[in-house]
A protein has these predicted regions:
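Alpha-helical membrane insertion/targeting regions
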Residues: 1-219
Length: 219
């Protein structure tokens, strides 16, 4: 999913660079309904893309146990940066999807706007809970809210993978499948995230990793 997200991100970056490298008098005549949003609202888009890149690159480091154990300062500072970038990216992503759904505010465009209006604030809530839990030294809950927030952020990558598979299979266009795959992608990631949390939850504050507990029981 990281690579799928990166592929989608670099595709949009390439489009933006190409679009602004040429003089275009009337963008409406050149770009389709999906692409023109990137041109007309480039400041919001660039902030979303750049900080999204930071999330995809540095996010996985937060979930590697030996980095947490050996380089705790890096883990803490990386976490702060990641939380900040995640908050801005969640807001800009929701803002774009709610205010400028590429099929308008009717039909599947309304579905796109609705799912963004739900997922955006929920992602911000997960990030807030992750921060507040670690401030309270509740490591177990912090870990769980971090998993939830990252699963939500990777939902767009899952959406893109689903679109690559389902559009050729169904013969339906992107106008229909974009919102549908977004809903399905988010549901898949939320479900997998919650399942992983349930399978790896530790008692108490979660200061010890579940594998360590299993080792002690085995011994």
């Amino acid at each position: 999913l990281i690579f799928a997200g990166m592929s989608s991100l670099f595709s949009r970056v390439g489009f933006m660079v190409d679009a602004f490298s040429q003089e275009i008098k009337n963008p409406e005549e050149i770009f389709n309904a999906f692409d023109i949003r990137y041109v007309q609202h480039f400041l919001v888009v660039w902030s979303h893309l750049i900080l999204g890149f930071v999330i995809l690159v540095f996010g996985p480091f937060q979930f590697i146990p030996w980095i947490r154990n050996r380089w705790i300062k890096f883990h803490r500072w990386n976490g702060r940066v990641w939380l900040l970038c995640g908050a801005v990216t969640a807001f800009t992503g929701a803002f774009i999807g709610v205010v400028w759904p590429f099929t308008g505010h009717q039909g599947f465009g309304l579905l796109q706007a609705t799912i963004n209006a739900i997922i955006g604030p929920y992602t911000l809530f997960c990030l807030y809970k992750a921060y507040s839990c670690i401030r309270a030294r509740n490591i177990g809950a912090h870990r769980e809210w971090m998993i939830r927030s990252f699963a939500l952020m990777l939902g767009v990558a899952t959406q893109r993978v689903l679109m690559l598979v389902l559009i050729p299979l169904t013969g339906l266009g992107a106008e229909v499948m974009f919102a549908s795959c977004m809903v399905l992608g988010m549901l898949i990631n939320i479900s997998v995230g919650e399942l992983w949390i349930k399978l790896t939850r530790t008692p108490g504050t979660g200061n010890r990793h579940w594998k360590e507990l299993d080792r002690k029981i085995a011994l």
